[in-house]
């Protein structure tokens, strides 16, 4: 009987710590949910879990550790992005806390589902292997499909969930197919090993522009581009954003994007630096189209949720600039942008949540009329968010855009920087319209509509506003933290 | 923070951020309208008082920046927080701190959301002071864009009937022009960063104006690249000034703005454009400024004539004065691009003069509008007999604006035309500008005559009463200054002399560009 030994794989808890802890914690919250219906307990538990997960990242911050046969990595970039995602998740839970029961969606599964999704994102951000990237993408997507349809008695929510599921399924297909093609050509799934393999190609004179390899890279990027709603893979965004429960929309618009962009960054910069001129050119065009399309179409929207959906497409374009710059400056600028965008967009959705009545799925711009009179503080917060989205100083939106354009210009993507500022002007038009509506137009409604600025939501909004001003005035705090971000290239 | 003045404290930062402190205090005075007004007036007067030591401790013989203070703000990007002041910005800073209390005092009748109104004016003051003092391009841009926000709300919430159209136009027009400056700033900062790193020098001053002035010729930029960079700055400033043909936001914004907003807009906000042209377009790109002096002067002259003709055609008094601003600001651009000592001195002095006289005109129009609720010139007439004190002040401000010798406007315009005549811009453009002076007399006297003489109609201009003591007290300091500048202009030109001489020498000695280099 002695010849049967069970060999435990070497588990590096530092590397896996953040996603694993959050996953386990989410299961705990799920179990607790069976015994209590007190939402406050669930919220508190979830926030504690997020906090501990963030602390796990702080323990070894600064060191670079690779684990699980180099499939996962624990590095500064990963931890930093994870922190932003965790902060975004915490804000999401705060702003959802009173909204869900108000909409008759009091199922406690909401909290563990969000934590599951976040855990998948953390995993994705730390992935350095095509297989782990796939696992990460699927973990977060499956939780998100459920969350999108969480308000399923409402027709639009169900429609959004089906749409997201079907198209997401297609995207997953592309992802797997792309991985298969890349593996077929290089015999590797590890990002760094793919790069090594390609450099051997180069040294032996084998052409890099092999159509099958290029198709593989393209398919993976289509799948990730779908997740970040990059033009022309954005078409699902407005419908899903409109139909999903607003906190879920808020969450998807920042966290999913952040995680998928982080994966894209690693995929392009670690595995395919050899093809940089090709993807910089192609994705440069996509980035330009994304910025232009998102901002121009947003001008025509009168529904606020759809407007923010198109605006989030546009912001994906700006973040793409940081990815494309493919430099230390670009990576650092990307993280700052992600932080600024997370705070701002969650804040803006929080204000919508505070105004959303039960059974009122469509949210028109004109509903904001006279908000400056009705609840000036909420309107003031929304003003800060809108100025930040438009990139007006002294908000975080400006500081982060400055960093992105600087990185793009430095990487000789000057035409993208110019398109970026021009589209920023277009975006100012519709963000300003929100401000005009709130402060300068009076409501026609005879009876005042109620606002639901509850304690937890207000806390979320206040945190967002303070964060935006802090990053806007003292971006150095965060740029210092995000300095010298080098993507790990393990053997 | 490193401080280089003899006062022992960072006076410039104090002056810039005091108004913001006032605005925060005002936020806690909700519901106490009267107290808030008195507080805002007192606080802005305090800011003015605090800014006076700058004038008294200003060293006339020093050409460089004074009261210099800085700390490393975003070292990773090469951005520093840097404030400093020289002969060009000295009077503009004082003009800002001087005009703001008067604007606040003129807004005594704002009944709706008074606290917000006063807070916005104080925030506006902070932004404008920051623009005149910032010596780092990034910091400058932050203040520059920030000035849009309070004015946007001032016009949009307390303005006239078409206020939303006017304020959105104002914001988008200036924002659109400014983002190209952002690209220019990013490009210059990156070039400087690389150059400094290459030379083994500390890179934390990459966006500093002084370092850029010293290094810009070492970047190896081609003629075209320099011109594009120049344009990215120039367009932003041209819109702000506003220079023909990008002036169209101004009449709308001026007409719809509340009186205090118009005063700040005319007196200080437009000057940011002129200041920016001197500080950035001329100082950073002296060769391009020389090369393009004539085309820019042509735009300025067209603006002078065009503004004057349109001003004459207006039936709305406020619009008339707004177009007169287009005409007058053309003179300032003409003076700047004369690129010699006399022209630049005249331009800076004229910025102050225009601030005082047009500010006074907008105040007067606001005062009479509050009583009659009409701005149609045709409705007015015969106010000589009814409200003589008002008419005395109107006559004084009109004459100053026309450029009557003995008052401030004459000195500025005279210096500008002398400078332009003596420069490559030449006598033809100067002659056309001189026509603008004559036209100014035509349209401003038409306005004065229409208001003061002729038959008085009780029906069309009802409830007229003469200026109150408060209103006289607002106008008096402005008028006294107009007279003082007119009689003792040397006191005002003296502090800027050294700076402007140095600037003239700098431009004259700028290495000529070799084509295709």
Swiss-Prot record, chain A:
Family matches, as Pfam families:
Proton_antipo_M (PF00361)
InterPro entries xref list: NADH-Q_OxRdtase_suN/2, ND/Mrp_TM
Q: What family classification does the UniProt entry report for this protein?
A: Belongs to the complex I subunit 2 family.
Q: Does the keyword Nucleus apply?
A: no
Task: List all membrane-crossing ranges.
Answer: 15-35, 41-61, 77-97, 105-125, 130-150, 165-185, 211-231, 247-269, 279-299, 307-327, 333-353, 378-398, 416-436, 459-479
Q: How does it assemble?
A: NDH-1 is composed of 14 different subunits. Subunits NuoA, H, J, K, L, M, N constitute the membrane sector of the complex.
Q: What is its EC number?
A: 7.1.1.-
Where does the protein end up? Answer: Cell membrane
Q: Which GO terms describe its cellular component?
A: plasma membrane
User: What is the protein's membrane topology class?
Assistant: Multi-pass membrane protein
* Entry keywords, A to Z: Cell membrane, Membrane, NAD, Quinone, Translocase, Transmembrane, Transmembrane helix, Transport, Ubiquinone
Know the name of this protein? NADH-quinone oxidoreductase subunit N 1
Query: What does this gene product do?
Result: NDH-1 shuttles electrons from NADH, via FMN and iron-sulfur (Fe-S) centers, to quinones in the respiratory chain. The immediate electron acceptor for the enzyme in this species is believed to be ubiquinone. Couples the redox reaction to proton translocation (for every two electrons transferred, four hydrogen ions are translocated across the cytoplasmic membrane), and thus conserves the redox energy in a proton gradient.
Report the catalytic activity: a quinone + NADH + 5 H(+)(in) = a quinol + NAD(+) + 4 H(+)(out)
Any GO BP: ATP synthesis coupled electron transport
The answer on whether this UniProt entry bears the keyword Translocase reads yes
Q: Which HAMAP family match?
A: NDH1_NuoN_1
